[in-house]
Amino acid sequence: MRNSKKLIYRSVRIGLSMLLLSAVTVAAWPQTVPDFSGLWKQDNDRCQPKRSGDVTLHIEHHDPELTIETLISFGSQISRHAVQKYTTDGKVSVSTGADGDEFRTSVVWKDSSLVFAIEEHEDGRILHSQETWSIIENGATLQRTRERTNGEKQILFYRR
């Protein structure tokens, strides 16, 4: 009887040790991050507030490298084009936007979203904002939430 209790306790200890080891292994397993690569078209009707114009993003994402090509057109007006290169390790990149403004941007991961800290130099002013980019709706939609002192905007793009 005494030996059977020892055997039971030993089995329980071994089982708990294995459970603890597997939990630590899962917690230490590298988390996968979404791939933002693709061709994305702005969904004007679903944006908050609603937007106009034709905006297309061509994103190449090979983490930590992130390249975003933006094409903007408003009917018959001249279109705007810009290419920005970032890294997702928090290093600041300097680029020129489609509107000609200078941007100083750092990008980091927060869970499965990209967070952009943006400093825009426009007409002698410096504007600070933050954008959070997430892939939603089973990979069909890119959601950009822009936070500025004058409010928050949500810009949605669908995958083409």
What does each model-identified segment do?
Residues 29-160:
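Hydrophobic small-molecule pocket/channel-lining residues, especially in calycin-type beta-barrels
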